[in-house]
């Protein structure tokens, strides 16, 4: 028995509903939504997690380099120095890396409409 009742006018947002905010990335999940009212509109603040598009046989993930630029690291899945046992964190050659880059993105909706950027 499902005791949760979803208000039918509230949308279910999927990663495919939004455009990636970072060139060359894909949105893999939408997390931790928070709703607020501002200027007569309903706002939604989402945590958006993006990663590089994956290639067959490789694991790729974004990092910020020393120049504060996003850089993509990519390794063969069969590399003995790679530990990908946790899908959130990649360990390579003793160094831990997050598999996605997350940021906050606001969306808004006017009464009765869907959310927009």
Regions found by a protein language model. Name each.
Residues 1-117:
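Beta-rich carbohydrate-recognition and catalytic domains
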């Amino acid at each position: 028995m499902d005791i949760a009742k979803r208000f039918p006018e509230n949308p279910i947002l999927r990663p495919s509903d939004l455009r990636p905010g970072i060139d060359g990335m894909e949105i893999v999940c939408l997390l931790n939504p928070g709703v607020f009212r501002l200027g007569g509109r309903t706002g939604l603040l989402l945590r958006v997690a993006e990663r590089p598009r994956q290639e067959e046989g490789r694991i790729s993930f974004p990092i910020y380099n020393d120049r504060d630029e996003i850089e993509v690291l990519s390794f063969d899945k069969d590399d003995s120095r790679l530990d990908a046992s946790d899908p959130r964190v990649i360990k390579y050659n003793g160094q831990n890396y997050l598999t996605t880059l997350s940021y906050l993105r606001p969306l808004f909706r006017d009464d009765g409409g869907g959310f927009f950027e």
